[in-house]
């Protein structure tokens, strides 16, 4: 077996990762087996933005997904990881708009709709593959031939189908309601795209004169109204007070004169009003504030829209009733002085005019949150516009029940409450966007403005009996991106066709996603899926059985990673490494706010003075898994990454040690398993059990810890060392047993670790497989290790644990007394239990070899020991005679520390047992255990004190 000598000194990830991945992909190993007799397992990846690039959050979530996918594939399941990308309407349109502005000095309007959309498709073709290539670098075992895009023909058909069916069911309608309006981008945006920024503003107190000689309780002929938005006051249709506010109760139902506009508006009572805010009187502007909009609906107030879509003051107010239709007979003229003014210029002028009229009572500083569009970067305006809506309440009820009944489980469970709180207070969903890039709304208008909804124009004409003379114009708007991504689990599997993939893989098994999109995406997927996908009995299908919610990956200081903070880490840089110069360019080039560049460069130079070293994909994946404690945000830690790169090197070196051992004997013949062989097999079996249990609970951190602990602390640090005496002095049967155990445990360990660290395990496994007579092509398709009940050996575990403690105690004595490792020592035991005496008898040779001992002796009960350094292992006293070795002062200093340690433990337990609350609440068994520990420490303390006296007397 000459191949065992062909293993490089070091593992070089960059030399093997991409070649291995290419081989896996070309061999079709990522495809489902389509074995109808095997259980199916499917994960649908949250589709990243098509023009985006991979960030640490993607790497984190995808590592966890790939671990589950690889594990289930090795379990023999028919496994599909469904991937794809999202067209990301507003984000993609903006990227391309910025690009043509920078390169050609043009806007999308210069191109026109069709040409601009073609420009986006070109951009998608150019940059759309970036993220897929980066995902390959992570080792993601995705069936790339099934990759989908939310604007593929198939998915577009599914979107139209859903829209038309919901419209036919009366669940989609068009109406004029208040939305988040971005005055720069000229589109409605979702709450998720609104960023509330802390701002130092003002609270203006204006006097609104009372009409018809009415007076307040304290004799004033006006009410003082507090507002943070003077510019919208021209659209006021009421002022409101709290119904129980005694100051104003007598005025409810009376009217005030709206200054500047000179129209009468009512004083209404509503519990929405906070009596403590300002003066306890607020203006109600239903067309320009979400809360006021709800108040307006309750009191049947007209909505007076005074802003254009650019957020300038209109020439004529638009007056709408609570039914969303134009309202006749309500006068609301906008004074000429304000027409056409930009909203903040209007604010200034209105405040100045109030002051000139003597109606400005006071201005107070006020901290407030101003909503900004996260893409347009300007304050959002609540705006009355015509939009398409989904009436989601009927869909939400079914989706709530699915979680209540446990058909869908959230991990961690506390996220169910967040889901319920959103879903039980759900509002109709605005699904139209005033963009060009996206799924065009399948609705057409005739010259009279009648609306026709169907899958295409041809269907409109046949469905509504319209001949070709009727001119039709398609709705200009596109659908909210979340509408199409809400269909993701079933549209990607071929719905509305009843495909074999849909039958085989739906519902999917688990969704791994961030908490921030539970409502925007997760809830909508549940609602849409359960409405449109039914099983053979007509029961609504869930999209997935489990939602595993991850935290955010933050930087080492706990800050959110963002381009503007300059603290973004690119997963590919963790894999390949990056120079400081390139990292600086990446973090400070093309910045939206160039003034931050110097600060970012300084922080980067401090943190990454040498740049970032290459760590390889496996080290990155292992780190991400090890940090994945349930649902918590993660502070990224470069030291952990280095530690896990060292772990990969340790695994490589251990494998090399095993496979290049010239004494390795895998021939047929008699075998005699040693205690160490039995122990390592039992330990491995426990590790498999821990890994499987942890993975079933989505505790990826515990899976990683189990592999790390076994590989580093048991296999490498102990078992490899325990085999050295066998290879040096064992008989043929013992050497065969050690050889078999080494190679078989290593091969199984590689299979166990493969889902987490696929590249290094495949690379080593290719070298190991010949030693264990496996001819298969890839570790990927090997069975995942099972828990083997007959491999548990508690006796071997207990015996080795005791021997390890003895060996460590002797090694510590050597280190503390500065005795060279090569120098043979004698070891004496006192107070040795019968059980441990038996172990010692059988394992003396092993103990001598491992602890470099010349002699091992058990002292009789009354036998005096020579001058010696002592350590305790349980109740047994270990004595190493020090004639010719000892440094009296150093030994006394060491014993003083030991005495302090034992005294502290005795004191700690005494305090615990004298704590009445502890004794009252703790179970009897716990108290008994503490008393037992107390006796052990007390006894140990006395022995060390005796030893101290003995050495002091020398």
Swiss-Prot record:
Annotated Gene Ontology cellular component terms: cytosol
Motif ('HIGH' region): 48-58
Compartments where found: Cytoplasm
Gene3D superfamilies cross-referenced by the UniProt entry: HUPs (3.40.50.620), Isoleucyl-tRNA Synthetase, Domain 1 (1.10.730.10), Valyl-tRNA synthetase, C-terminal domain (1.10.287.380), Valyl/Leucyl/Isoleucyl-tRNA synthetase, editing domain (3.90.740.10)
Main location: cytoplasm
Binding, ATP: 563
Record field: catalytic activity: tRNA(Val) + L-valine + ATP = L-valyl-tRNA(Val) + AMP + diphosphate
Keyword list, A-Z: Aminoacyl-tRNA synthetase, ATP-binding, Coiled coil, Cytoplasm, Ligase, Nucleotide-binding, Protein biosynthesis
GO molecular function, one term: aminoacyl-tRNA deacylase activity
CDD domains: Anticodon_Ia_Val, ValRS_core
GO biological process per UniProt: valyl-tRNA aminoacylation
Function: Catalyzes the attachment of valine to tRNA(Val). As ValRS can inadvertently accommodate and process structurally similar amino acids such as threonine, to avoid such errors, it has a 'posttransfer' editing activity that hydrolyzes mischarged Thr-tRNA(Val) in a tRNA-dependent manner.
Self-association state and partner proteins as the record states: Monomer.
Family as reported in the entry's similarity comment: Belongs to the class-I aminoacyl-tRNA synthetase family. ValS type 1 subfamily.
PANTHER family in the record: VALINE--TRNA LIGASE, CHLOROPLASTIC_MITOCHONDRIAL 2, VALYL-TRNA SYNTHETASES
Name of this chain's protein: Valine--tRNA ligase
């Amino acid at each position: 077996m000459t191949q065992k000598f062909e293993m490089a000194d070091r593992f070089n990830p960059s030399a093997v990762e991409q070649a291995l991945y290419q081989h896996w992909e070309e061999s079709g190993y990522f495809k489902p087996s389509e074995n109808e007799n095997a259980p199916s397992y499917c994960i649908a990846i949250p589709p990243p933005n098509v023009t985006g690039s991979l960030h640490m959050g993607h790497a984190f979530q995808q590592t966890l997904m790939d671990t589950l996918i690889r594990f289930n594939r090795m379990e023999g399941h028919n496994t599909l990881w469904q991937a794809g990308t999202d067209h990301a309407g507003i984000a993609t349109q903006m990227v391309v708009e910025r690009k043509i502005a920078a390169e050609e000095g043009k806007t999308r309007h210069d191109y026109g709709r069709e040409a601009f959309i073609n420009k986006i498709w070109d951009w998608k073709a150019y940059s759309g593959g970036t993220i897929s290539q980066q995902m390959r670098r992570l080792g993601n075992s995705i069936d790339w031939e099934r990759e989908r895009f939310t604007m593929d023909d198939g998915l577009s058909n599914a979107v139209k189908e859903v829209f038309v069916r919901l419209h036919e069911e009366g669940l989609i309608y068009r109406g004029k309601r208040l939305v988040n309006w971005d005055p720069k981008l000229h589109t409605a945006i979702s709450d998720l795209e609104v960023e509330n920024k802390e701002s130092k503003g003002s609270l203006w107190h204006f006097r609104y004169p009372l009409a018809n000689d009415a007076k307040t309780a304290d004799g004033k002929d006006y009410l003082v109204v507090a507002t943070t938005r003077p510019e919208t006051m021209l659209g006021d249709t009421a002022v409101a007070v709290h119904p129980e506010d005694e100051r104003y109760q007598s005025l409810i139902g009376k009217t005030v004169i709206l200054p500047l506009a000179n129209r009468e508006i009512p004083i209404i009572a509503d519990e929405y009003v906070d009596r403590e805010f300002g003066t306890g009187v607020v203006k109600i502007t239903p067309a320009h504030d979400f809360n006021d909009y709800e108040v307006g609906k309750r009191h049947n107030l007209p909505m007076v829209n005074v802003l254009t879509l650019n957020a300038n003051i209109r020439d004529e107010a638009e007056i709408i009733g609570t039914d969303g239709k134009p309202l006749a007979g309500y006068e609301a003229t906008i004074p000429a002085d304000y027409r056409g003014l930009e909203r903040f210029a209007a604010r200034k002028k209105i405040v100045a005019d109030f002051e000139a009229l003597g109606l400005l009572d006071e201005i107070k500083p006020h901290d407030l949150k101003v909503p900004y569009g996260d893409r347009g970067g300007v304050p959002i305006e609540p705006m009355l516009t015509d939009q398409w809506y989904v009436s989601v309440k009927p869909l939400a009820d079914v989706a709530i029940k699915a979680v209540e009944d446990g058909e869908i489980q959230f991990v961690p469970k506390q996220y169910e409450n967040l889901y319920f709180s959103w879903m039980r207070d759900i509002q109709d969903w605005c699904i139209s966007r005033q963009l060009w890039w996206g799924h065009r709304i399948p609705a057409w208008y005739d010259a009279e403005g009648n609306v026709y909804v169907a899958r295409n124009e041809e269907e409109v004409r046949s469905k509504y009996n319209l001949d070709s003379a009727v001119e039709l114009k398609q709705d200009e708007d596109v659908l909210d991106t979340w509408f199409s991504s809400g269909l993701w689990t079933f549209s990607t599997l071929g719905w509305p066709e009843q495909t074999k993939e849909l039958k085989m893989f739906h519902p999917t098994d688990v969704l791994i996603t961030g908490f921030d999109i539970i409502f925007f995406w997760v809830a909508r997927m549940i609602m849409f899926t359960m409405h449109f996908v039914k099983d053979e009995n007509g029961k609504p299908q869930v999209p997935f059985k489990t939602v595993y919610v991850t935290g955010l990956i933050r930087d080492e200081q706990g800050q959110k990673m963002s381009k503007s903070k300059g603290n973004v880490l690119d997963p590919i840089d963790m894999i390949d490494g990056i120079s400081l110069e390139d990292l600086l360019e990446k973090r400070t080039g093309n910045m939206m706010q160039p003034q931050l560049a110097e600060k970012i460069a300084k922080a980067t130079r401090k943190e990454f003075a040498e740049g970032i070293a290459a760590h390889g994909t496996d080290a990155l994946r292992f780190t991400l898994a090890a940090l994945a404690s349930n649902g918590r945000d993660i502070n990224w830690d470069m030291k952990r990454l280095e530690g896990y790169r060292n772990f990969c090197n340790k695994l490589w070196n251990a494998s090399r040690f095993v496979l290049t051992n010239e004494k390795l004997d895998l021939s047929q013949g008699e075998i005699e398993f040693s205690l160490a062989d039995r122990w390592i097999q039992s330990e491995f079996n426990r590790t498999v059990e821990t890994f499987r249990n942890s993975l079933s609970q989505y505790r990826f951190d515990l899976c990683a810890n189990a592999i790390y602990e076994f590989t580093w602390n048991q296999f490498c640090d102990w078992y490899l060392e325990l085999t050295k005496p066998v290879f040096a002095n064992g008989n043929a049967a013992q050497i065969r047993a050690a050889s078999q155990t080494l190679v078989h445990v290593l091969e199984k360990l590689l299979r166990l670790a493969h889902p987490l660290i696929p590249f290094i395990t495949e690379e080593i496994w290719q070298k190991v497989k010949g030693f264990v007579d496996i001819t298969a092509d890839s570790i990927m398709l090997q069975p995942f290790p099972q828990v083997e009940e007959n491999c548990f050996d508690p006796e071997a575990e207990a015996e080795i644990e005791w021997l390890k403690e003895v060996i460590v105690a002797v090694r510590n004595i050597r280190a503390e007394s500065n005795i060279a490792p090569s120098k043979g020592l004698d070891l004496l035991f006192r107070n040795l239990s019968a059980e441990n005496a038996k172990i010692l008898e059988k394992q003396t040779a092993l103990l001598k070899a491992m602890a470099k001992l010349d002699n091992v002796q058990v002292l009789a009960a009354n036998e005096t020991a020579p001058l010696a350094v002592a350590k305790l292992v349980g109740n047994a006293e270990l004595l190493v005679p020090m004639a010719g070795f000892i440094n009296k002062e150093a030994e006394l200093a060491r014993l003083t520390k030991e005495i302090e340690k034992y005294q502290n433990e005795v004191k700690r337990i005494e305090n615990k047992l004298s704590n009445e609350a502890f004794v009252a609440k703790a179970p009897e068994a716990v108290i008994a255990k503490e008393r037992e520990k107390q006796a052990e420490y007390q006894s140990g303390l006395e022995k060390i004190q005796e030893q101290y006296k003995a050495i002091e007397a020398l």
